[in-house]
Curated annotation (Swiss-Prot):
The active site is at residue 189. InterPro entries: 6-PGluconate_DH-like_C_sf (IPR008927), 6PGD_dom2 (IPR013328), G3P_DH_NAD-dep (IPR006168), G3P_DH_NAD-dep_C (IPR006109), G3P_DH_NAD-dep_N (IPR011128), NAD(P)-bd_dom_sf (IPR036291). GO terms for cellular component: cytosol. GO terms for biological process: carbohydrate metabolic process; glycerol-3-phosphate biosynthetic process; glycerol-3-phosphate catabolic process; glycerophospholipid metabolic process; phospholipid biosynthetic process. NADPH binds at residues 12-13, 33-34, 107, 138, 253, 277, 279. Catalyzes the reduction of the glycolytic intermediate dihydroxyacetone phosphate (DHAP) to sn-glycerol 3-phosphate (G3P), the key precursor for phospholipid synthesis. This is Glycerol-3-phosphate dehydrogenase [NAD(P)+]. Gene3D superfamilies: N-(1-d-carboxylethyl)-l-norvaline Dehydrogenase, domain 2 (1.10.1040.10), NAD(P)-binding Rossmann-like Domain (3.40.50.720). Its main location: cytoplasm. Its EC number is 1.1.1.94. It catalyses: sn-glycerol 3-phosphate + NAD(+) = dihydroxyacetone phosphate + NADH + H(+); sn-glycerol 3-phosphate + NADP(+) = dihydroxyacetone phosphate + NADPH + H(+). NCBIfam families: PRK00094.1-2, PRK00094.1-3, PRK00094.1-4. It is found in: Cytoplasm.
Amino acid sequence: MKESIAVLGAGSWGTALAVLLAHKGFRVNLWARRPELATALRETGENKTYLPGVRLTGTIIPTADLPAAVKGAGLVVLSVPSHAVRSTARLLKPFLPKGTVVVNTAKGLELETKKRLSQVLVEEGLDRVAVLSGPSHAEEVGRGLPTTVVVAAADRETAEYVQDVFMDPTFRVYTNPDIIGVEFGGALKNIIALATGMADGLGLGDNTRAALMTRGMAEIARLGVALGGKVLTFAGLSGIGDLIVTCTSMYSRNRRAGILLGKGQSLEEVLDAVGMVVEGVRTTAAARELACQHGIKMPITEEIYQVLYKGKPVGDCVAALMERPRTHEVESGDW
């Protein structure tokens, strides 16, 4: 048996990663915040709430005891929603040996501070942090379908350590030193998935979806590069790769939420119907404020913000985007 790994967060993604790591021979302590969920996982051998149909092997140990989950773990995987990253880090820190690698898998920004989640973890005293991102729906990873992702960290040793832990015949992992770009790509694509979902809900067709994805990628890269990311990162797995899967997949919560909004449901009704965290809602507000602070144009993000927080009709956003003043496609383009 290999070293043990703690996966904190027993939602769909945490469960899928626990299954992947257990398949590789690791003992996995899967921490659930709610004791009743941990009990259900132990008794049924399945996460029927968040990842039904995927069996949990005997080397996955569900628990609601955080100190027990972390004790002896060579690696900690953080799979909680973005708004819970800081509070979970504070719970984790007293029990974490110095130098333990913590891999964040949430894709979002902290709404209150507008900070990337790796920044939040470092602020809370976690000294070796990596980020795992890319086009990777839990429903497919849990079933062992081929998936390719990227891990970013401040140093190569940490990134390659995480790469080796997760690399599997069905789960290919690349490394990237650009942690800023990787995090912004993973977070901001959820906004564009809301937009494409709204277009689908309105029945606007493939042309509209393609336009939103393409111009959405321009917005993502514009803000990400302004805040220190590398432009090529946004052409990679954590950028365009994650954008494609999140904007087109039936598994995408953000796309599903957008579809329901496009069909006229209120945000409250949509969140209740989806039943799980829709990261794009909070990320839209955080990204809009960052864009305003840094003078970055993000017209799609602005329109999604108006829908989510100001009650603007979705159909009016289409007209607002289509009737913007004419401009160049590529800002640096010369004739």
